Amino acid sequence: MKLSVKNLSKTYKNGVKALDGVNLEIGVGMFGLLGPNGAGKSSLMRTIATIQSPDAGEVFFNDINVLKDNISLRKILGYLPQTFGVYSKMTADSLLNYFAVLKGVSNKKERVELIKKLLEITNLEDARWKNVSGFSGGMKQRFGIAQLLINNPKLIIVDEPTAGLDPAERQRFLNVLREVGSNSTVIFSTHIVDDVKELCNNMAIMNNGRILKQIKPEDSTKELKGKIWTKIVEKADIESLNNKLNILSTSFNPD
């Protein structure tokens, strides 16, 4: 399996160029898309998921021309956006059952077995009969993984899934994603470096709508080794140091 993105560009009506000639080759396994807020990650995710159209470029997943045959892509796609709504009075079981019917699982016995399996994978067995609207942030994200796995997707897209999660929930979510990502092509966008280092076997760094580098996570910081350091200085010296050095960030200590 391979996802190919070729010269993808997108400019919004307000003049913001979200994608600027993006090229990527992504195979099976976990692929991290790392970049700050506003880098264009979500725009790229939505375009690959056929939610929005680009101004130019091509996207292929195996032999599917994604931009011209979005129906075929959606049959094998699992997508988890940054935020998603749920029906306020539906339990995890009833909502997964509803999604399974929508995705073509017509046999009731098959749906029951599938839902049980999905809740086990996502560690939500104990919450099966609870309303999803009352779930914590991490539980909702894991429920999102459960619903996207219903159609056994070959391409999985998860957009900033760990943002706002506490450390324990974040780790639980990463464990679930790690388990489901071994036999599919999974694109995982984040601005958290540790997420990519812990989870992904390949990655790209994105900013200002461009792919700056596609690289292995373990190699991503080698070029910077020995070139970045922290130093305590007097406030009065900051201006002169700014003129001599490339300062990434500063913080003021009143003590």
Q: What do the PLM-derived regions correspond to, one by one?
A:
Residues 172-255:
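ABC transporter nucleotide-binding domain
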Residues 156-159:
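Catalytic Walker B motif of ABC-type/P-loop ATPase nucleotide-binding domains
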Residues 57-68, 72-73:
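Conserved ABC transporter NBD signature motif
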Residues 97, 101, 109-127:
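Conserved ABC ATPase "signature" region
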Residues 36-40:
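Walker A (P-loop) phosphate-binding loop of ABC-type ATPase nucleotide-binding domains
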Residues 131-135:
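Conserved ABC ATPase signature
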